[in-house]
C-alpha cells in the first residue's frame, strides 16, 4: 500500500521535499496557509512596480535543476535565469566604492582602488574558502550530515577540525588573511545569507564566498517568484496534491509517532510521515504544544536569526550609480552586529542591502522610474517589541543614510512605499519571532549547526527549511527538502529488508 506523506508549508523546502517524495512513489499532500507556493519567495506588484518580497539573489542553481532532472526534465523549460557577472557594488561612508565581480582577476581589473597586495590576499582567501566549500560539499551537502559528531565520524577528527576550521569565527578567518578594511567588511557581510554576525558565526561559513564566486549569482527573469511557480508546476505534474489557503492547526500524536494533522476546516488527515516546512520551534509550540521548559531550552541553543525592516520603494527618478545588487556599509561593522545580535536594538548605523532589479529587467518599473528594495537587518521580535514610533525613527535613519551616501533627494522621489516589519513576517509565514533566516549561526551556541532534520521527539516527523541543516537561503532550504526525502527513502528501504 502506498504510504502517505503530509507536507506542512509550501516554502522552497516544503515543495522540494514534496517533489522528491512524489518522484519516489509516495502519495503526497501539501498544505499551505497562504494562497501562493514559495513561502518567503513572494511577490508584490503595485502602480507598475514589481518587488520580490523575500529573497532577491539566486545562487547554486544546480540544486534546483536536480529536482527537474529526477523527472527527466529541464528547468530551463519552466523558468529563465540569467547570470550576473557583476555581482554587486559596495558603498562605504567615506565615498569609496568596490565592485565585486565573478572572478578575482575581474574584480581587480574593475577596481583601481585595490592594490596588487589586496588582490593577492583576496585570491588567498578564495583558496581558503574553496577548501572549506569542497569538504562541506562532501558530507554536509551530499550526505545531509546534521551534527558535529556525524561530521567527525564521516571525515575523521583531525580532518574535520582543520578543514572545517572550527577554531575561528568567520571574521577572524577573514581578518587573518585580508588587511584591506573595505574588503574585510564586504567579505564579512556574506553572512547576510544566513542572517547572523560574522563575529559570532564559525569560520566554516566563509565558504559562502567561494560558493558565490564559483556557482555565480543569478537573476530569475520577471522576478524570483517565477522559480517557485516552476517548482509548483513540477510538483503538480509529479502528482503532489497541493492545498493553498489551508492552515494546519495541530499535529496528532500517538506515543512517539505523529499520526496526522487537523486542518483549520476541522478535517483530520492521516499520514505515515509528516514533513514540516514550518520552523522547528513554532511547530513544537503551536502544532504539538510542547512544554515551556523544553521550548526555552531549544531556543537558548537555536536562537532565531535576524529579521529585517524591508522597504519597497517606487521612485520617480533613476540613480545611475546603483547596480542590480548594492550594499551601503556602516561606519562600524562590529557595533552594527553587536546592536542587532547582542543588545537587540535597532542599529544606529545599519548596513543596508539595496536591490534594484530594474537595472537588469526593465519590466519591473515604469520607464524612467526605479523599483528599490531596502533591507537592513534588525533583531527578531523581542519580549518587548519595537513600537510604531521606533520603526518610524528607524525609517528616517535609513533614508538619511541613503541620501547622505549618494541617493540625492530620495524622500522627494518616493511615489510608492510598502513596508514589512518582523511582525508582518511572523504573521505571514509563522516564522519564529519574525526571523527571516531561521536559526542564527553562532560558534559558541551551536557551532553553526541548525536543528537536525529528524525530530528528536517523534520518530516519523521531519523538518525542512531555514531552521534545520544545512541552513537558510534559497539553495540550502531547497537542499534540505531533498535531504529529508533521502532520509525517508533510506529508512523505508531499511524497513523492507
Curated annotation (Swiss-Prot):
FAD binds at residues 7-19. Pfam families: Amino_oxidase. It is an enzyme of class 1 (oxidoreductase). It comes from Staphylococcus aureus (strain bovine RF122 / ET3-1). Pathway: Carotenoid biosynthesis; staphyloxanthin biosynthesis; staphyloxanthin from farnesyl diphosphate: step 3/5. The keyword Flavoprotein applies. One of its GO terms (biological process) is carotenoid biosynthetic process. This is 4,4'-diaponeurosporene oxygenase. InterPro entries: Amino_oxidase (IPR002937), Carotenoid/retinoid_OxRdtase (IPR014105), FAD/NAD-bd_sf (IPR036188). Involved in the biosynthesis of the yellow-orange carotenoid staphyloxanthin, which plays a role in the virulence via its protective function against oxidative stress. Catalyzes the oxidation of the terminal methyl side group of 4,4'-diaponeurosporene to form 4,4'-diaponeurosporen-4-al. Keywords: Carotenoid biosynthesis, FAD, Flavoprotein, Oxidoreductase, Virulence. It catalyses: all-trans-4,4'-diaponeurosporene + 2 AH2 + 2 O2 = 4,4'-diaponeurosporenal + 2 A + 3 H2O. Its cofactor is FAD. Its EC number is 1.14.99.-. Belongs to the carotenoid/retinoid oxidoreductase family. CrtP subfamily. GO terms for molecular function: oxidoreductase activity.
Amino acid at each position: 500500500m502506498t504510504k502517505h506523506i503530509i507536507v506542512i508549508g509550501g516554502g522552497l523546502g516544503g515543495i522540494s521535499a514534496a517533489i522528491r517524495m512524489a518522484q519516489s512513489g509516495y502519495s503526497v499532500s501539501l498544505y499551505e496557509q497562504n494562497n501562493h507556493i514559495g513561502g518567503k519567495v513572494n511577490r508584490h506588484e503595485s502602480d507598475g512596480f514589481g518587488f520580490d518580497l523575500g529573497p532577491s539573489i539566486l545562487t547554486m542553481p544546480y540544486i534546483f535543476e536536480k529536482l527537474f532532472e529526477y523527472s527527466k526534465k529541464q528547468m530551463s523549460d519552466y523558468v529563465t535565469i540569467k547570470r550576473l557577472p557583476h555581482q554587486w557594488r559596495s558603498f562605504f561612508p567615506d565615498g569609496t566604492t568596490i565592485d565585486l565581480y565573478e572572478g578575482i582577476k575581474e574584480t581587480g581589473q574593475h577596481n583601481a582602488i585595490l592594490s596588487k597586495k589586496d588582490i593577492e590576499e583576496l585570491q588567498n582567501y578564495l583558496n581558503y574558502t574553496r577548501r572549506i566549500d569542497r569538504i562541506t560539499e562532501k558530507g554536509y551537502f551530499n550526505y545531509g550530515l546534521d551534527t558535529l559528531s556525524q561530521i567527525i565520524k564521516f571525515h575523521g577528527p583531525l580532518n574535520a577540525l582543520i578543514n572545517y576550521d572550527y577554531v575561528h569565527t568567520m571574521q577572524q578567518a577573514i581578518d587573518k588573511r585580508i588587511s584591506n578594511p573595505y574588503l574585510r567588511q564586504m567579505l564579512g557581510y556574506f553572512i547576510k545569507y544566513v542572517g547572523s554576525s560574522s563575529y559570532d558565526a564559525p569560520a566554516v561559513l566563509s565558504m559562502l564566498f567561494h560558493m558565490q564566486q564559483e556557482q555565480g549569482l543569478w537573476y530569475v527573469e520577471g522576478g524570483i517568484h517565477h522559480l517557485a511557480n516552476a517548482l509548483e508546476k513540477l510538483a503538480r505534474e509529479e502528482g503532489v496534491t497541493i492545498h493553498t489557503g489551508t492552515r494546519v492547526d495541530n499535529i496528532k500524536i500517538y506515543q512517539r509517532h505523529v499520526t496526522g494533522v487537523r486542518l483549520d476546516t476541522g478535517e483530520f488527515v492521516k499520514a505515515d510521515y509528516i514533513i514540516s516546512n514550518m520552523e522547528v520551534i513554532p511547530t513544537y509550540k503551536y502544532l504539538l504544544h510542547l512544554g515551556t521548559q523544553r521550548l526555552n531550552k531549544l531556543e537558548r541553543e537555536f536562537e532565531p536569526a535576524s529579521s529585517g525592516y524591508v522597504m519597497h520603494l517606487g521612485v520617480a527618478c533613476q540613480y545611475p550609480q546603483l547596480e542590480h545588487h548594492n550594499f551601503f556599509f556602516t561606519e562600524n561593522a562590529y557595533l552594527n552586529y553587536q546592536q542587532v545580535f547582542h543588545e537587540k536594538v535597532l542599529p544606529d548605523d545599519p548596513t543596508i542591502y539595496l536591490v534594484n532589479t530594474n537595472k537588469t529587467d526593465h519590466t519591473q518599473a515604469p520607464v524612467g522610474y526605479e523599483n528599490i528594495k531596502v533591507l537592513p537587518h534588525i533583531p527578531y521580535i523581542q519580549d518587548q517589541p519595537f513600537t510604531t514610533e521606533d520603526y518610524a525613527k528607524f525609517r528616517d535613519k535609513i533614508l538619511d543614510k541613503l541620501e547622505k551616501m549618494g541617493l540625492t533627494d530620495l524622500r522627494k522621489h518616493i511615489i510608492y512605499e510598502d513596508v514589512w516589519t518582523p511582525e508582518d513576517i511572523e504573521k505571514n509565514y509563522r516564522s519564529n519571532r519574525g526571523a527571516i533566516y531561521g536559526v542564527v549561526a553562532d560558534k559558541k551556541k551551536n557551532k553553526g549547526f541548525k536543528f537536525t532534520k529528524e525530530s528528536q521527539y517523534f520518530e516519523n516527523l521531519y523538518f525542512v527549511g531555514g531552521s534545520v541543516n544545512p541552513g537558510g537561503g534559497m539553495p540550502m532550504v531547497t537542499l534540505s527538502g531533498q535531504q529529508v526525502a533521502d532520509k525517508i527513502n533510506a529508512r523505508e528501504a531499511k524497513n523492507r529488508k
